[in-house]
Each structure stands twice: as structure tokens, then as C-alpha cells.
Amino acid sequence: MVSHGSSPSLLEALSSDFLACKICLEQLRAPKTLPCLHTYCQDCLAQLADGGRVRCPECRETVPVPPEGVASFKTNFFVNGLLDLVKARACGDLRAGKPACALCPLVGGTSTGGPATARCLDCADDLCQACADGHRCTRQTHTHRVVDLVGYRAGWYDEEARERQAAQCPQHPGEALRFLCQPCSQLLCRECRLDPHLDHPCLPLAEAVRARRPGLEGLLAGVDNNLVELEAARRVEKEALARLREQAARVGTQVEEAAEGVLRALLAQKQEVLGQLRAHVEAAEEAARERLAELEGREQVARAAAAFARRVLSLGREAEILSLEGAIAQRLRQLQGCPWAPGPAPCLLPQLELHPGLLDKNCHLLRLSFEEQQPQKDGGKDGAGTQGGEESQSRREDEPKTERQGGVQPQAGDGAQTPKEEKAQTTREEGAQTLEEDRAQTPHEDGGPQPHRGGRPNKKKKFKGRLKSISREPSPALGPNLDGSGLLPRPIFYCSFPTRMPGDKRSPRITGLCPFGPREILVADEQNRALKRFSLNGDYKGTVPVPEGCSPCSVAALQSAVAFSASARLYLINPNGEVQWRRALSLSQASHAVAALPSGDRVAVSVAGHVEVYNMEGSLATRFIPGGKASRGLRALVFLTTSPQGHFVGSDWQQNSVVICDGLGQVVGEYKGPGLHGCQPGSVSVDKKGYIFLTLREVNKVVILDPKGSLLGDFLTAYHGLEKPRVTTMVDGRYLVVSLSNGTIHIFRVRSPDS
């Protein structure tokens, strides 16, 4: 980049897009300069003129159109001079390959001159060798500079040609501009000087430039000073935004961990209370059964004695009654003396007592506080840290701790720990985790960036300028899954990096991602027609060559080969770019999704609503329609992936659903519920446990589904830095790679609830 104090070279002005119109993207024709100093073609400005005003396409400044039209905008003689130089270098007889002499037709009267070998920089004429030898032999031309034509067209004399080049008057062709009218500030030729400006004070151009250059240079120096201040302010603003995003990511992780800890504690309390309730009911039931057995025995004895006495009194004769009177009376008196109805045992009825804070809407377990961040000094030594270091640590120490009997209590780590190490300790049903166990679950064990003790963390540079948007939407709280068996996987930010490389001519448009080798990803950049390799840490590893003219769309890595779709064709190439085979696909859809099977020896591609599977030799192994023939014409799989369990997962834009099917096309599950927020389902990826990660580009989300296709909740949102996510892939079954529309890639580690 050219610094403010240096002057741009003529070669840069001629070779760059400086002479191209930013509207029609062609070389400028009749260039006109707006007051904002942006130059466009006169015809292009006429098309933009609306209601007597023109809005600059670059700076968006609106300027009024002069009453005479856009032709009255100031003519850019500087650009005209550069254009004349470019046209002069490119002119010539294209059929003969060499330009013709401009003087021979005038001297000899022929229609065409001889081949030109030289050029006069003052006359701007091409000359043959004979005319060039005598060109400087006259009083008017003895100071002219004649140079070799080959060197001139190669650009060797551009600087000298510019010095000798005279600007032409637009009103009088052939006349050079020589004067400046001081009252009118208008450039004049000799003819213009004699007409309306005859009585006006005029200066020669060289003298006028010497008089006015110091004022312009002073204004330029003032603007350069403003630019320095603006750059410094922009740098400070970017650093503040990076610190904000870094702190937001840190606080978001803390919120998720705190919410997860509270949920774990609540679930543990639920199990504990339900266990106490079951034990109480079982003990009460056992005691009640014993009492019931005793009462039933007494009842049977009394009922039998009463029945016997009743039969004797009803059916016995006098002698028989009197003979048994003593025995019956004794037994009945004995039974009457026993406690027939003992008082019931005390029965303690369970009652649930809820903490008042659970029902209090004003009780906030999580609360944010906002503090004005102080400017950060670059030369900080040990203990300086980032904005969110000691200050956020002190805030965490001042926060009230959530306590319960035998439950969870979030703890603050020491000041030297990074946010990823400052995990909120939680307890499972059998007890509390130790700090060492919690540290073992951080991404450091997987090769992530290690924290810098006491100094500025490395990851600030990774955050800086990466995440483009932070939504005001609250961070999603992942709850228990549908069967109630624990929590969902949650994301842990790993790294972020851009995919635009120095050799790219255009901004990347990532249309495909796939894992490639150990801890690498392969990126299909359709805009730059490249398959780029990156490590999980964002290191650029080069490219996999593709056939000339191919724009890779979707990509999948197989055993020692790469499959990708491009322009209704399926290609299989080796890592060196050699084409193994290609297959023509249906033209009925704009793009074809490609996915590798778990075995790595076959590739699946979506074609007009069905799935075709090819082996390494290019033979069609199988073909099926999700849902069978009954679904013919009813499917449109735009995104496709496979699961470690051997299932196919696709985003069906015709049914607006996510469909899961086996290798025979039998539908295992399908989701088309309100969790899609009315969006078309986007890219899909599957982790090692079968969880499905679905991208919803319109709402900046990645949601998670269970292996059967039931929606579980949000996994990533705009809070995590997502801005129009495009495609995703899963690496090693635990790293979710997400590409954004601006070419940036975010990587999140998928942390399972039982880890």
C-alpha cells in the first residue's frame, strides 16, 4: 500500500484500474469528475442522473447536476492525458502488426506511409526511419524528442512522454491548452484567449501551477494528517470491537456453563427429591401392609367366632345351646376385650417446598453489567492482560454464588487462568468434579492455542476483525434432550480465519467443505475456481489442482482421491489434480451436493431429487429416491451428507424438510416443523454420535437435531459471530466448521454433555 507521503508512479496509474469506469467497468470515455473527485464516463453519469441530482456510486455523496447537463461537470484532463498515452501505446496497424508513418502520406501524397520505427514525443506522431532521421532538421522541431517505437510501446518513455504531452482544448481541436484565466479558473488555448477572455488576466500554465501548487500541497498535508488520525481512530475502534467480541464470547461461554451448571444441579436435585419421595412411600407402604395383615387376621378370627355363635343360636336346640354357652361366652368376651380398632399409624404426607426465588420473576440468576472499557496500551508487560482479564475476574468474584445442599457452587479461578480454564465447577449425582477434571475438558487437549500466562492472550489476534456481527439476541440455553437423558452438545469456539489468499482475484465464495486428511479441511472456492487446503488452526496448505475452467461447487474427500461437482458434472481427481473419471449429471438443477460414504470408497451425489452412489472406478453402485418411488418428483436435495451410522441426511427444498434415510432409501426420520423459522433448510453435518447440525442461513443459526430428526434446540446463533452461514462440515466427528458468506471460516468444538 502506498503511504501518504509517497507519490504514486505513472506505471501504477496506467496498469491499475485507475482508468476504468467503476460503473461500466470499461475504459473511461469522455471522463467527467464529480465534486467528490470520483471520475466516470459522461454517458454513465447521464444514466445515473435522476431528478437533477447524481449519487456517486463509490462515496454515496449526492451532487446537483448543472443546468447544462452532466457534460458541464469538470473535464478530467489528467485522466484524458493518461488515456491518450495508453491509446498511443496501443495504436497501430493491427493487420500488419506495425503502425504506419504519419508523415509519409503528407510528404509523398500516398494513402499509407511506410512502417513506423520511431515516435516523436512532442508531435505524438509515429515516424518511419527516413522521416525520423530528418524530423529534427527544422527550426520548429529541432528540440523534439524522437525515440524508438518498440521502447515507447513497451513503456520505457512514459514519464518523458507525459512531460512533453500537451493537453488539447476540447473547443478547438488541435490547439494545446496554454493559459489559465484567473477570474474564470478556466484552461485556455490561444483561440480561447482571443475570444471571451481577451480582457481577463491570464497566466501561462507553468506559472499558474507554481503559484497554486503550494496551496494545494498545504491542503493535501492537512488531509494527510486527518488520514493519520482517522487510521488511528479506526485501529482503536477495531481493537475496541475485537475486545468487545472477545469479552462477549468469554461471557457467553460463562453464561452457558453457568446455565448448564444450574441445570445439572436442578436435575440432580430432582433425582434426589424423587429418590427421597420413593423411599418414603415404600417405607410407608411396607408398614401399612404389616398393619393390614394383622387387622385382616383379627377380622377373620372374630368373624369365624361370631358366625359359629350365630349358627348355634339359630339352629341349636335348648340343650345344645346351654351346653356351649360357657365356651361361646368366654370366647366372645375374650374377643371383645382385644383392641379391635387400633389407631392408625402416623402417615407423613409429602409436601414440596419451592425456593421463593424460583417463582420470583425479579430473581435473576444471571445478570449482565456493562462497564466502560479503558484504552489499552500496546506495551503491557506481565500482568497487563486484556480488558476482560483481571476486571472480569474481580467481577466474577463479587457475584453471589449459587448454593444448594450437596449441589453446585460456581467458583472463580485464579487470575492467571484464561476464560476457557475458568470453568464453573458442577456436580454430577455422585459428587463434584475436581478442577483438574474440568481443565481436562477444555480444547487445549486437542491442540488448541495455549494461553499466555500473565501477558496478552494470543487469541485476541484471532478474534480481531474476524467476527463481523454480534447480535443482540440472547445466547441460546441448551436444555435436556427430548428423552430427558442429560444435556445437549454445546459449542466451544476454537478459531477463526479468512480464506482469501494473495493470489485470489475475487472475493471467495465458499460452496463446499469437507475434512481432508488429519486435522485438515478442503474448501471449494467457486469464485476463484480453487480447492484450498487449510489446517484446523487456519494455516494455508496450498491447493488441490482442478481441471482448467472448472468451478468446484460441492466437494468430498475419499481414499486418496477428491470428488467434486462442477457445471453438471461429477469429477474424481487424485491429490495431484489428475482426473480419474468424470460423469455427466442432470441439468435440471443448478448445483449438485456431494458426500463421501463412511467407508471412504464411494461418493454420493444428489441428482434431480434422487441420490446416486458411485464407486472409485466411476461405476454406478446404487440409486434411490428418499421415500421410494412414491416420492418421485417430490424431492429436491440441495445439501447432502452422511452419518457414521451409514445414513444419508439431506436438505429437501421441495418439501422444506430435513430427511434422513438409509442406504436403500427408506426414510428413517424427517423434520419439517416450526423450528425452521420458515427458512429453507441449509447445509447439514453429522457428528460421531449422529447428532445433525442444520444451517438456517436467513436467521443466522445452526440448530441441532437428534439422529431421528427431532429438533432439540439452537446450537449456534448470531451471538456466536454467525453472519449468513453458508456451508458446514464435521471434522474428526467433533469439530464443526462453518463458512460465512464473506469467506470467513469459524471452527467450533462440539462438546458432548458427558465429557
UniProtKB/Swiss-Prot annotation:
Zinc finger (RING-type) boundaries: 21-60
Coiled coil (residue ranges): 216-314
Keyword Zinc-finger: yes
Segments of skewed composition (Basic and acidic residues): 392-404, 419-447
Positions of region (Disordered): 371-484
Pathway(s) annotated for this protein in UniProt: Protein modification; protein ubiquitination
Record-listed E.C. numbers: 2.3.2.27
Residues that bear Phosphothreonine: T418, T442
Domain of life: Eukaryota
Reaction equation(s) it catalyzes: S-ubiquitinyl-[E2 ubiquitin-conjugating enzyme]-L-cysteine + [acceptor protein]-L-lysine = [E2 ubiquitin-conjugating enzyme]-L-cysteine + N(6)-ubiquitinyl-[acceptor protein]-L-lysine
UniProt xrefs under SUPFAM superfamilies: 3-carboxy-cis,cis-mucoante lactonizing enzyme (SSF75011), B-box zinc-binding domain (SSF57845), RING/U-box (SSF57850)
PROSITE patterns: ZF_BBOX, ZF_RING_1, ZF_RING_2
One Pfam entry name: zf-B_box
B box-type Zn finger ranges: 98-149, 164-205
Location (main, coarse): cytoplasm
Subunit text: Homooligomer. Interacts with STING1. Interacts with TICAM1.
Function recorded in the entry: E3 ubiquitin-protein ligase that plays a key role in innate antiviral immunity by mediating ubiquitination of CGAS and STING1. In response to pathogen- and host-derived double-stranded DNA (dsDNA), targets STING1 to 'Lys-63'-linked ubiquitination, thereby promoting its homodimerization, a step required for the production of type I interferon IFN-beta. Also mediate monoubiquitination of CGAS, thereby promoting CGAS oligomerization and subsequent activation.
Protein known as: E3 ubiquitin-protein ligase TRIM56
Provenance organism: Homo sapiens (Human)
Upper lineage: Eukaryota, Metazoa, Chordata, Craniata, Vertebrata
